[in-house]
Amino acid sequence: METILRTENLCKIYGSGENQVYAVRNADIEIKKGEFAAIIGKSGSGKSTLLHMLGGLDYPTSGRVYLRNEDIFQLKEDDLAVMRRRKIGFIFQAFNLVSSVNVWENVVLPMGLDGQKIDVNFVQDILHTLNIENKVHSLPNTLSGGQQQRVAIARALASKPDIIFADEPTGNLDTKTSDEVVALLKMSAKKYGQTLVVITHDEDIAQIADRIFVIEDGKVGSRG
């Protein structure tokens, strides 16, 4: 199976001298195409820092991140920004929806801003899969938290990225809604052949992943 993402001795250090702190220490990670991987750790363990480097949002102190064998931090800043827009999808705890435009516009907005052709049939299928096709004309503030997160998931899927990163995607949701959103997220990723990496502190979410990475005090280990 093709390797989509891998790292080599990835490190992130804050401070210097006696105040030096390793947020991430010599992380070696490999994720295959189509996998649902979970990175689990307690608050402050370094998991969000790790995600930001994997997604090209923050530079490492040392080490490498390869997306489809391309060393992303060797790219020029403009080229890295293009890669993030076109090859990486992000889902965050806070939804990050634009309050002044409707569901459909929120989903297709990133592609429109990037000048990409919008596959209308594909987007409609995603909205149907996530059971929000009847909300396309609704504004985000009229939706429940679970529905808003489904819109965020649809937005990440719509551009057909190589990989999707979800940072505590159920952090603002109740348990029942969280379970529904995670099940939909996994099902959607499988249906559309997406590779999914979820950052979480929730063991229940991690247990349904294909591969689990555990981060503690910046050190990353694999559980399967």
Annotate each PLM feature.
Residues 1-3, 224:
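Short, Lys/Arg-enriched, disordered terminal segments
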Residues 212-224:
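H-loop (His-switch) and adjacent beta-strand-loop-beta switch element
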